[in-house]
From Swiss-Prot:
Name of the protein this chain belongs to: Transmembrane and coiled-coil domain-containing protein 2
Gene Ontology cellular component annotations, sorted alphabetically: membrane
Keywords annotated in UniProt: Coiled coil, Membrane, Transmembrane, Transmembrane helix
Signal peptide: none
Matches recorded under PANTHER family: TRANSMEMBRANE AND COILED-COIL DOMAIN-CONTAINING PROTEIN 2
Gene that this sequence comes from: Tmco2
Pfam families associated with the record: TMCCDC2 (PF15844)
Cellular compartments annotated: Membrane
Topology term for the membrane: Single-pass membrane protein
Organism whose genome encodes this protein: Mus musculus (Mouse)
Amino acid sequence: MPTFPTTTSSWDNLLNALARSSIWNWLQAMFIGETTSAPQPTNLGILDNLAPAVQIILGISFLTLLAIGLFALWKRSIRSIQKIVMFVITLYQLYKKGSDFFQVLLANPEGSGRQIQDNNNIFLSLGLQEKILKKLQMVENKVRDLEGIIVARKPASKRDCSSEPYCSCSDCQSPLPTSGFTS
């Protein structure tokens, strides 16, 4: 009968990882190799005590809104599966954003994590502004080209509009006759 190598150290690592308070600590222990026997103490005060309750409230509200929305869509019509799927995806994204915001708040209660997110939004905004500027420059070039085409098609000689009572041509330099009323 073959003998298997002892794997008590990997079982111990697995049990230690399962005993940790967050998945982040477990990921650090597995991939980076940090092994701390006790979780690091945090001093979050009331936020530390409210974290499980808020996450449960977020989960319950997500499931409640999901049930209400699905019931409303089902009562209305079953033919639109795409609307139901879009509703579920949107609701899940809202839940994830709320949960992520709460996790950032738990990780850094001073609020500097929000500043990092704002910096990312600034870079995103700058990239979007660059794209808009390029599109505007492209439109401006097309307008110039169209103006050139219009000028090229315009007749070189001006028409004599003096014989017509009301001139409707665009290259007439004389003012239009009025009906006696002046403004």
